[in-house]
């Protein structure tokens, strides 16, 4: 009986240590989430501005049809998917839901298996695809908790350049969209060719206030790739925010589970201890009766 008490006590101590670790990790994820949400809000100011400027400059082109390759749909021979996952686990179902959505998309739209490629951001996704011999054009691992544009610029600009060079004909980003600390939504969004600019949102009055040099066309030649890059970067920031929220929720759940286990083990410990005391009393009484 004493051995059982010792074993239960060890399990309680071990679970308490685990609970302290998961509680600390939850607090870390919570702090990261706050920073990431603020970064996302700050980026939206830039994203809204570049979207408005791009739409205004394209005002006439959107209505009559632009010849810029960033806007023109061409026959689809190959599709690229930027898949954003985490580098580590302990984020609940964050990675599995994204990867399931990607695999479902591949199954539905690419039965031949040779008309798509993956651009992977995050080690979990890279390892998943390579283990299944799914083509990965290139990857990025070790992303910071709040990535700067400089950190991801190479993979973003490379993706846009590959599209311009017709190495693939459309580009999607697969990621988890952050809604709040408890909710996220997997999205598979088309980024190229650019199709989210609405001519009705354009204002010729805004363009009239611009001094365009050397020309509108020359500016758009530089601006459209930057706009596409901003869309991808925005998705990365959004995904990181969702990742931190998932990590915080997972660690809170783990802490709650640890508390429940400790509670159950403590009750078990008390029952076993009470049984041991009762057994000892019974033996003492029996011994005393034997002496009488």
Swiss-Prot record:
Gene Ontology molecular functions: ATP binding; proton-transporting ATP synthase activity, rotational mechanism
Top-level taxonomic group: Bacteria
Membrane-topology annotation of the record: Peripheral membrane protein
CDD domains named in the record: F1-ATPase_gamma
Gene Ontology cellular-component annotations: plasma membrane; proton-transporting ATP synthase complex
A Pfam family this chain is assigned to: ATP-synt
PROSITE patterns: ATPASE_GAMMA
Location(s) in or outside the cell: Cell membrane
Keywords, in A-Z order: ATP synthesis, Cell membrane, CF(1), Hydrogen ion transport, Ion transport, Membrane, Transport
Gene3D superfamilies, sorted: 3.40.1380.10, ATP synthase, gamma subunit, helix hairpin domain
UniProt-listed SUPFAM superfamilies: ATP synthase (F1-ATPase), gamma subunit
GO annotation, biological process: proton motive force-driven plasma membrane ATP synthesis
Leader peptide range in chain numbering: none
HAMAP family noted in UniProt: ATP_synth_gamma_bact (MF_00815)
Subunit structure: F-type ATPases have 2 components, CF(1) - the catalytic core - and CF(0) - the membrane proton channel. CF(1) has five subunits: alpha(3), beta(3), gamma(1), delta(1), epsilon(1). CF(0) has three main subunits: a, b and c.
UniProt function note: Produces ATP from ADP in the presence of a proton gradient across the membrane. The gamma chain is believed to be important in regulating ATPase activity and the flow of protons through the CF(0) complex.
Stated family: Belongs to the ATPase gamma chain family.
Protein's name in the database: ATP synthase gamma chain
Gene name, Swiss-Prot/TrEMBL: atpG
């Amino acid at each position: 009986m004493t051995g059982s008490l010792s074993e239960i006590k060890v399990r309680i101590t071990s679970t308490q240590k685990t609970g302290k670790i998961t509680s600390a990790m939850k607090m870390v994820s919570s702090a990261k989430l706050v920073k990431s949400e603020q970064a996302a809000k700050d980026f939206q100011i830039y994203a809204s501005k570049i979207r408005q400027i791009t739409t205004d400059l394209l005002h006439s082109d959107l209505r009559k049809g632009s010849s810029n390759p960033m806007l023109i749909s061409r026959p689809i021979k190959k599709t690229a998917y930027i898949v954003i996952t985490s580098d580590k686990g302990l984020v609940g179902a964050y990675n599995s839901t994204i990867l399931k959505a990607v695999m479902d998309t591949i199954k539905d739209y690419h039965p031949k298996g040779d008309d798509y490629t993956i651009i992977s951001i995050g080690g979990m996704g890279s390892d998943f695809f390579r283990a299944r011999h799914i083509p990965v054009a290139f990857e990025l691992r070790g992303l910071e908790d709040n990535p700067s544009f400089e950190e991801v610029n190479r993979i973003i600009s490379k993706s846009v350049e590959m599209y311009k060079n017709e190495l693939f004909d459309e580009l999607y980003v697969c990621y988890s969209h952050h809604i709040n600390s408890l909710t996220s939504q997997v999205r598979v969004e088309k980024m190229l060719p650019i199709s989210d600019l609405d001519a009705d949102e354009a204002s010729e009055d805004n363009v009239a206030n611009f001094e365009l040099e050397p020309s509108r066309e020359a500016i758009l030649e530089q601006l459209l790739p930057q706009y596409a890059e901003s869309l991808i970067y925005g998705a990365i920031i959004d995904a990181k925010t969702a990742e931190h929220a998932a990590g915080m929720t997972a660690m809170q759940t783990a802490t709650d589970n640890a508390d429940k286990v400790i509670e159950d083990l403590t009750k078990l410990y008390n029952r076993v201890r009470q049984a041991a005391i009762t057994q000892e009393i019974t033996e003492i009484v029996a011994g005393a009766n034997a002496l009488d």
